């Protein structure tokens, strides 16, 4: 019996999201031009700080993260939590193998650039909690499993990100006889940044879902409220990138080879982690949908959080922040390509694709079981 083929990934995106790589490139170009053409802009933006954190960057990050976290169904954890193979494998990939791989790649490719190396290590610690939902839907992954893994990663990041940053930037390099991060690195600063930039939108998203469903019902919340706030995630992302590139424009233009060197380990990281997730899911017989979810939640990184931590800890014009800024430029095209790779790999999984249960980017309550 011939099975239906899933629709092309590009056809499953809304108009603005379909052109996301282009919007990101335009935001970067706009930021670079503004930084070069408007005298004193970088100084003015850098002066807008609260508690040592850039106010424009903070606003952009919070606006971007809230809509995505408001989509998560925090109460539906039972069935997925009972899938021990998925949960254990996800935890190992996300919190053991992926940070260790990024640590190794950062030292292999950037041994002479400590600021960029530190930025990449921070990126490796920030597990994706935003765009992964889109990649998962495009690849026909398990939406509820993605929601659970995103929620768990969100909570785990609030609790453990600071300690892991301290371990990979100070403890492990010391054990291996490598140079450690400068004394300016602060475990407290990392933890505060995570609590502010992840904890606030996480709490706001959870409270919004509880209050929205209780007052107006799930149909209204998912069919009306979420579509209204959804575009603001893109606006916040583009605003943040534009501001960062306005601040970093001189460095980007002056050091294109450094930017290229930052990009290389990121590409290797995405490909290796995604392949590991798909292979482990196939070996463990998780089924295609949950395997795709496992691979994308492991491969994607929360560059928004990494940028926030780098900016809050090392400064808005630091090399660490630049390493985080390069992230979205590399992540978006690579993960779009991996969506196609996942759909191609679908033929190697026993469960046939079913259009009746394929996820959509803008689900309503009636689409849910």
What kind of feature is each model-predicted range?
Residues 1-70, 75-298, 303-369:
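Alpha-helical transmembrane segments of multi-pass small-molecule/ion transporters
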């Amino acid at each position: 019996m011939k099975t239906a083929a899933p629709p092309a990934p590009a056809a499953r995106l809304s108009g603005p999201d379909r052109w996301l790589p282009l919007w990101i490139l335009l935001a970067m170009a706009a930021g670079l031009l503004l930084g070069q053409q408007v005298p004193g802009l970088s100084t003015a933006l850098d002066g807008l700080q609260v508690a040592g954190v850039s106010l424009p960057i903070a606003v952009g990050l919070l606006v971007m993260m809230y809509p995505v976290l408001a989509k998560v169904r925090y109460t539906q954890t039972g069935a997925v939590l009972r899938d021990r193979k998925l949960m254990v494998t996800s935890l190992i990939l996300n919190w053991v193998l992926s940070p260790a791989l990024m640590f190794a790649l950062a030292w292999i490719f950037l041994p002479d650039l400590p600021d960029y190396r530190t930025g990449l290590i921070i990126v490796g610690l920030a597990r994706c909690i935003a765009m992964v939902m889109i990649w998962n839907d495009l690849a026909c992954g398990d939406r509820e499993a993605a929601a659970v893994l995103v929620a768990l990663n969100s909570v785990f990041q609030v609790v453990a990100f600071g300690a892991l940053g301290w371990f990979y930037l100070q403890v492990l390099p010391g054990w291996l006889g490598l140079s450690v991060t400068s004394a300016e690195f602060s475990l407290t600063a990392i933890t505060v940044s995570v609590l502010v930039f992840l904890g606030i939108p996480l709490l706001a998203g959870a409270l919004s879902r509880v209050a929205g469903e209780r007052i107006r019902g799930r149909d209204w919340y998912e069919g009306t409220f979420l579509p209204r706030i959804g575009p603001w995630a893109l606006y916040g992302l583009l605003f943040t990138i534009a501001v960062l590139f306005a601040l970093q424009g001189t460095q980007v233009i002056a050091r294109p080879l450094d930017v290229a060197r930052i990009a290389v380990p990121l590409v290797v990281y995405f490909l290796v982690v995604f392949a590991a997730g798909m292979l482990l899911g196939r070996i463990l017989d998780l089924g295609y949908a949950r395997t795709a979810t496992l691979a994308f939640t492991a491969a994607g990184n929360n560059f928004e959080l990494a940028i926030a931590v780098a900016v809050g800890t090392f400064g808005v014009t630091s090399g660490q922040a630049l390493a985080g800024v390069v992230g979205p430029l590399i992540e978006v095209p690579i993960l779009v390509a991996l969506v196609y790779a996942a759909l191609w790999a679908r033929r190697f999984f026993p469960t046939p694709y079913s259009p009746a249960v394929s996820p959509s980017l803008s689900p309503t309550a009636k689409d849910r079981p």
